[in-house]
Amino acid sequence: MKKFLVSIVCMAGGALLAACGTTLGSAEASAERAAAVKQALADRNFKIEVNFMYPMRGSSRNLTSEYSLEVRNDSLFSHLPYMGEARNLPYGGGVGLNFDEHISSYVQQQQKGDEYLIEIGVKNTEDVYVYTIRVFDNGRSSIDVRSRLRDPISYSGELSF
């Protein structure tokens, strides 16, 4: 009976040590991810893969195709779906939120510890857009898009490297 109790205590102690090691590995992975996010934002070289859209009118939608928003140095590559009211557009609806343009304004601030707020202004042949992007240390992101001729729309996704 004594050997049985000793073996139980040893197994419980081993399990406890293994659990602590897993937590430490998880914390290290989170710290590495946060450092990678910070570096990508500092370099102005990141891509957000979008998986949900939240139109102003109507319900949210899960996106199954590959939609993304990418910032590379002084350029914005917007490949996002749009659903909502649009006013005074060219025949056929125009390009929507699918364009590659130079960034006219870029402001980045670190918010409460684990959040970055980025505001990007861009103009194409149809409209002027303001992209407000929130990126968290774990890579989760939200994008709000405002323009003069279209209803606002929001997206959520994840930073990819």
Locate predicted features.
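Structural motif
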Residues: 45, 73-77, 140
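Short, surface-exposed charged micro-motifs
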Residues: 38, 66-68, 132
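Bacterial Sec signal peptide processing site at the extreme N-terminus
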Residues: 17-36
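Helix-rich interaction surfaces within compact, conserved domain-sized segments
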Residues: 101-161
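N-terminal post-signal-peptidase region of extra-cytosolic proteins
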Residues: 51-64
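A short, Trp-centered hydrophobic/proline-enriched beta-strand micro-motif
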Residues: 38-53
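Sec-dependent bacterial lipoprotein signal peptides
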Residues: 1-20
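Mature extracytoplasmic domains of secretory-pathway proteins
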Residues: 69-115
